[in-house]
Amino acid sequence: MADRLLAIIDPAGAKSFLAYSSIPVDQRGGIGSPRGKYKGWLGSLEPQAEDAGYLTARALIERGKKEKAFGRDGKLHMLAIAGDRSTPSSINRNQGMHRVVAEAPMVVLEEEVYAAWTRENAAQQAESLYRRYSDVKLIWAGNDLMAFGAMAAWEKRGGKPGVDAWFSGINTSTEALEAVKSGRMTALAGGHFITGAWALVMIYDYHHGHDFADEGLELRRPMFAEFTPALADRYIERFSGGFDGVDFSRYSKVRNGKLKRYNFGFAQLLEPQS
């Protein structure tokens, strides 16, 4: 889709910028890189999605160790419910999860399934997987909805999420944040939704004569924050009404002359205010 849009937009002399996801290299054909064939394609910014998978899987496994949620073989047994097999977001989140598993020899990843990002599919698949793998107590999910589906299937068996099985998810829905606060969800990462705001900061700087090219034309940056119950509470308190109170000029190189490198991590927006 992006390649077709560039072919329409660029001849008209309009500038363009891709936020959230660039065009995968293996799908570019003759498109090339920004400011090449399409001069008006300024660049792209995407969240480092692997971090979300890594942070949540790591926290989930650490909680499993703390709770001594070991199977009969003395290992931690985990299921992974991913979104899909093909989108960069899903692939990268899954890679982050797999990296943690590779670093943890006491963890057995029993099976990885794909639930198309939906609560209903995840619940249906989890119900079958729980019967198949009786030692599983850790369930990693590629988003919050699939985590809730897996929780519902666990509760249907008479279990209690956060008590006798532990779940992780990705996103910052109010339901997910409340689940972290209550203890039903053990690990949650999010904050990537604000990529659009960071992209506007970069475009603002470019428009005002400070080209972001000195940091690269296609940026993939850490953005995900790991939410503790305290941070979930702070997020709800601070941002439940929106983000109008955030002074994004602080993150602009034009407006903040001291800034040498863009920092697009979401965690900075959750820091205590003086």
Give the ranges of each region predicted by the language model:
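Hinge/beta->alpha junction and helix N-cap segments in small-molecule ligand-binding domains
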Residues: S22, S44-L55, A80-R99, V107-S128, ...
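Flexible loop/hinge segments that line or gate small-molecule binding clefts
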Residues: A7-D51, G74, A176-L177
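Conserved acidic residues
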Residues: L42, K137-L138, T186
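Hydrophobic alpha-helical segments within soluble ligand-binding/sensing domains
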Residues: K37, G43-K75, A122, T172, ...
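Structured segments of extracytoplasmic/periplasmic soluble domains
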Residues: I8-K15, A59-E67, V100-A104, S128-R132, ...
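Hydrophobic alpha-helical
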Residues: M1-A14, M97, V108-E178
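Active-site/pore-lining binding-face segments in mid-to-C-terminal subdomains
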Residues: D164-A225
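Hinge/cleft segment of the Venus flytrap/periplasmic-binding protein
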Residues: L76-H77, I81-R85, W198-S274
